[in-house]
Structure formats: C-alpha cells, structure tokens
Amino acid sequence: MKDKIINVIGLGYIGLPTAAILSQNGYRVYGTDINKDVVSIINEGKIHITEPGLQDIVHEVVKSGKLSAHNEPKLANIYMICVPTPLKEINNKFEPQLSFIESAIKSIKNLLKTGDMIILESTSPVGTTRFICDTLKKEGVDTANLNFA
C-alpha cells in the first residue's frame, strides 16, 4: 500500500497535519493548496499554522522528499479533499457551501484513472459524495471504476 501516491488537497488545519503524518509513515505525498505563500512556506520545511510538534515533522518529511507542496494537483492514486465547507445563511438557515469541494474535484478530473480513490475529509452534509460523483460525471469523468470514501 505504501507504493501508493497520495495528493492532499487543502493544506490547512486538517490537510497539512494529515499530509505530514502520512509522509512520516512512508507515503509519498503531494500537498496542493491554492495559496502560493502556503506552498512556499511548506516547501521550506516550515508551517503556517499552529500545531504542537508539526513543525519538526514537516521539516523532516520535506527534507526527505516524502512531502512537497504545489499549487496544482499532481498525479496520484489517492486524492484526499481537505478543503473548507463554510456555512452561509440562506432563508434564516445556515447551509454548507460546497464550492471549495467542487473546485477541488474539478482540479483533479483530468488526473483520475481506474482504481483511484477520492477521500472526502472535509466536514460535509449527507449527500456530498453523490454531489462529487455528479460533478465528475458532468465534467465527463467515468466514475464507475473510482473508489470513494
């Protein structure tokens, strides 16, 4: 399993620690974030968030080549979506906004191949995996041979 390449999309409070720990455990991990400053900081072996012990781990895994950060997703076997799902008030109800998830999914559509796995780590409402499948289908991706978690 450790021969699988993982692409973590979203390098915030969930994505960066997840990417770092996976890298520390022997996986090759590409981290993707739209913020160029975040990518630069991580590639220097530093962190942009506060998390006890994370700085040392990120420094170690970047130096070893197990973790690198990019502004665009890279080819992988497993894509882990770790982007925000902010709430927006609509008709006096707070509704989760799936636009960041949609953008993340669209950013990997041309990289997906048979057997790949998409893991949604973002806090999201019931039906979000169906939303992901429907989005991919609308983008012309055959989802029959993809795995979702």
Name what the model sees in each region.
Residues 2-5, 28, 34-78, 82-95, ...:
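Conserved N-terminal Rossmann-fold NAD(P) cofactor-binding segment
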Residues 7, 30, 68, 117, ...:
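A structural signal for isolated positions on well-ordered beta-strands in alpha/beta enzyme cores
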Residues 11-12:
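Glycine-rich Rossmann-fold phosphate-binding loop(s) that bind the pyrophosphate
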Residues 15-16:
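N-terminal Rossmann-fold NAD(P) dinucleotide-binding loop
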Residues 19, 23-24:
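Gly/Ala-rich phosphate-binding loop of Rossmann-like dinucleotide-binding domains
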Residues 31-41, 117-126:
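Extended hydrophobic secondary-structure segments
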Residues 87-149:
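Rossmann-like NAD(P)(H) cofactor-binding subdomain of soluble oxidoreductases
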